[in-house]
Amino acid sequence: MSEPGDLSQTIVEEGGPEQETATPENGVIKSESLDEEEKLELQRRLVAQNQERRKSKSGAGKGKLTRSLAVCEESSARPGGESLQDQTL
């Protein structure tokens, strides 16, 4: 009357949801799904950070170049322009 299959079914029914959450199978499945979700989220964050770094690096390089050209133009125009005007007067 007590077959192995009947015994395991009775234990599961008596344990209810508490035993189901305690089984390793459910824990492994949940942890795997969380790990996959965490991995995807980390990958998305890394991609976003890399894109921001690329933008900031390219923007910083352009800004430096623009400033250096502006400084060169101003410094070369003022002394040369003033000295020529002083000499002609």
UniProtKB/Swiss-Prot annotation:
Please list every transmembrane segment annotated in the UniProt record, as residue ranges.
none
Gene from which this protein is expressed: ARPP21
Residues recorded with modification Phosphoserine? S33, S56
| Location of this chain's protein in the cell | Cytoplasm
Task: Share what the entry says about its subunit structure, partners included.
Answer: Interacts with CALM1.
Query: What is known about what this protein does?
Result: May act as a competitive inhibitor of calmodulin-dependent enzymes such as calcineurin in neurons.
Q: Which UniProt keywords apply?
A: Acetylation, Calmodulin-binding, Cytoplasm, Phosphoprotein
State if NAD is listed as a keyword.
no
The UniProt GO MF terms for this protein read: calmodulin binding
- Recorded protein name is cAMP-regulated phosphoprotein 21
Supply the source organism for this entry: Bos taurus (Bovine)
Q: Which of the residues bear the PTM N-acetylserine?
A: S2
Q: What does the entry list under GO cellular component?
A: cytoplasm
